[in-house]
């Protein structure tokens, strides 16, 4: 249960700051030197990018067993090493993907008084927001967002969904329905690649009907000093599985590589970016990795992305699956629940991987 009913300070919309044509960003968005992105006058408009694995899910449904095995192996390797990969032929039509992004661009272009009708609070975070965490005086990120629940049905509240633009709720319903299908499919693949029954991870989440599904739409306005701030600070996702529909025009998602360098991801056309969350890392006993990532901002272009989070039921125990714990591979994490776990980011905001590290079992 979240004890926080309201934000500790008045909320300022980053979009309003950006549209005021200020020459310098307010101090509360300026990151400490150690956290600032490596953006110079030479690369701040077009950061150097790299491609993370692009996996064709359609190859899993051919008659070619060798190709199926190769595809499963590619997914397994990505989950174990980088924690991120892109998927194409994932089952959602390009038209629906484009429609969803266009609808949310319309929402963020609405007059501020209409958007503020959906202003959120730290009690549930549902609605239109501009900060994560409730620490007074915290350094904030350069972004606004909209957060809503899709499942389980007990948490789904259409009154918390935007009513404008027209047909927004219908498009959201179609989009989230397809997202759940993709997540359920990926959960089967992840289970099989661990040598488990294909429903094992899903059951560990509490089953299909009780697993959580929520959408966070991120809006990153133009920023006059992108070298001083971040759209989202470094963090690993606290939930289970994240499916990101990125902005193909503005590359800004960065993933921390094995050498600790930040890799800017080049989105593939009409692909989703998939990453493991902390709950999957714990259930897999760290076989699968949830990896730190962050978002840089741009002086000339705003960016919009849709992140769908697929999470365990809030009160089910989350701990390394017994099938993956042996004498040689003891349990690396103590038991928790997702409800307890996510209070960390809801109170303190994005903080690297410090929370999952706190749950490591003493050796």
Swiss-Prot record:
The recorded induction information for this protein reads:
Induced by methyl jasmonate (MeJA). Induced by infection with the bacterial pathogen Pseudomonas syringae pv. maculicola. Induced by wounding. Induced by infection with the fungal pathogen Botrytis cinerea. Induced by infestation with the caterpillar Mamestra brassicae.
Question: Keyword annotations for this protein?
Answer: Dioxygenase, Iron, Jasmonic acid signaling pathway, Metal-binding, Oxidoreductase, Plant defense
Q: Does the keyword Isomerase apply?
A: no
Note how many cofactor molecules are bound and how: Binds 1 Fe(2+) ion per subunit.
Q: Residue ranges of the Fe2OG dioxygenase domain?
A: 210-312
Binding-site list for 2-oxoglutarate = 218, 220, 303, 305
Return the EC number.
1.14.11.-
Q: Which GO terms describe its molecular function?
A: dioxygenase activity; iron ion binding; jasmonic acid hydrolase
Q: Could you tell me which SUPFAM superfamilies the record lists for this protein?
A: Clavaminate synthase-like
The UniProt record gives the binding positions of Fe cation as 235, 237, 293
InterPro entries, per database record = DIOX_N (IPR026992), IPNS-like_FE2OG_OXY (IPR044861), IPNS-like_sf (IPR027443), Oxoglu/Fe-dep_dioxygenase_dom (IPR005123), Plant_2OG-oxidoreductases (IPR050295)
Keyword Oxidoreductase attributed: yes
Task: Name the Pfam families on file.
Answer: 2OG-FeII_Oxy (PF03171), DIOX_N (PF14226)
- Residues holding jasmonate: 216, 342, 346
Outcome of gene disruption: The quadruple mutant jox1, jox2, jox3 and jox4 exhibit reduced root and shoot growth, delayed flowering, reduced seed production, constitutively elevated jasmonate and jasmonoyl-L-isoleucine levels, and enhanced resistance to the necrotrophic fungal pathogen Botrytis cinerea and the herbivorous caterpillar Mamestra brassicae.
- Catalysed reaction(s)? jasmonate + 2-oxoglutarate + O2 = (1R,2R)-12-hydroxyjasmonate + succinate + CO2
BP-aspect Gene Ontology terms:
defense response; negative regulation of defense response to insect; regulation of defense response to fungus; regulation of jasmonic acid mediated signaling pathway
Q: Which cofactor does it need?
A: L-ascorbate; Fe(2+)
Query: Can you tell me which family this protein belongs to?
Result: Belongs to the iron/ascorbate-dependent oxidoreductase family.
Primary role: 2-oxoglutarate-dependent dioxygenase involved in the oxidation of jasmonate (JA), a stress-induced phytohormone synthesized in response to attack by pathogens and herbivores, which triggers the activation of defense responses via the JA-mediated signaling pathway. Converts JA to 12-hydroxyjasmonate (12OH-JA), an inactive form of JA. Is specific to free JA, and cannot oxidize the bioactive form jasmonoyl-L-isoleucine (JA-Ile) or other JA-amino acid conjugates. Prevents over-accumulation of JA and indirectly its bioactive form JA-Ile under stress response.
Full protein name? Jasmonate-induced oxygenase 3
Q: Which species is this UniProt entry from?
A: Arabidopsis thaliana (Mouse-ear cress)
């Amino acid at each position: 249960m979240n004890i926080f009913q309201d934000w500790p300070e008045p909320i300022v919309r980053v979009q309003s700051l950006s549209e005021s044509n200020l020459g310098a960003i307010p101090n509360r968005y300026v990151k400490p030197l150690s956290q600032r992105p490596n953006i110079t006058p030479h690369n701040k408009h077009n950061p150097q990018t790299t491609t993370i694995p692009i996996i064709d899910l359609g190859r899993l449904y051919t008659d070619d067993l060798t190709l199926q095995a190769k595809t499963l192996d590619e997914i397994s390797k990505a989950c174990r090493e980088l924690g991120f990969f892109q998927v194409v032929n994932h089952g959602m039509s390009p038209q629906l993907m484009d429609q969803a992004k266009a609808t949310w661009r319309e929402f963020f272009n609405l007059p501020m008084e209409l958007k503020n009708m959906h202003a959120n609070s730290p009690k549930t975070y549902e609605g239109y927001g501009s900060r994560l965490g409730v620490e007074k005086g915290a350094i904030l990120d350069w972004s606004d967002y909209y957060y809503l629940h899709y499942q389980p049905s007990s948490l789904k509240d259409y009154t918390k969904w935007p009513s404008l633009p027209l047909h927004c709720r219908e498009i959201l319903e179609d989009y989230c329905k397809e997202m759940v299908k993709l997540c359920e499919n990926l959960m089967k693949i992840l289970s099989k690649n661990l040598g488990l029954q294909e429903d094992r991870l899903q059951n560990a989440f509490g089953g299909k009907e009780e697993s959580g599904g929520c959408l966070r739409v991120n809006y990153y306005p133009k920023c006059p000093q992108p070298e001083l701030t971040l759209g989202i600070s470094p963090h690993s996702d606290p939930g289970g599985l994240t499916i990101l529909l990125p902005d193909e025009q503005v590359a800004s998602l960065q993933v921390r590589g094995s050498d600790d360098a930040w890799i800017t991801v080049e989105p593939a056309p009409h692909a989703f970016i998939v990453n493991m969350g902390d709950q999957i890392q714990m259930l897999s006993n760290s076989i699968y990795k949830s990896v730190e990532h962050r978002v840089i901002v741009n002086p000339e272009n705003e960016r919009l992305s849709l992140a769908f989070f697929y999470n365990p039921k809030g009160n089910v125990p989350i701990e390394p699956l017994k099938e993956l714990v042996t004498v040689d591979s003891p349990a690396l994490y103590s038991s928790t629940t997702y409800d307890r776990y996510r209070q960390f980011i809801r109170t303190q905001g994005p903080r690297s991987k410090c929370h999952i590290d706190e749950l490591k079992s003493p050796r």
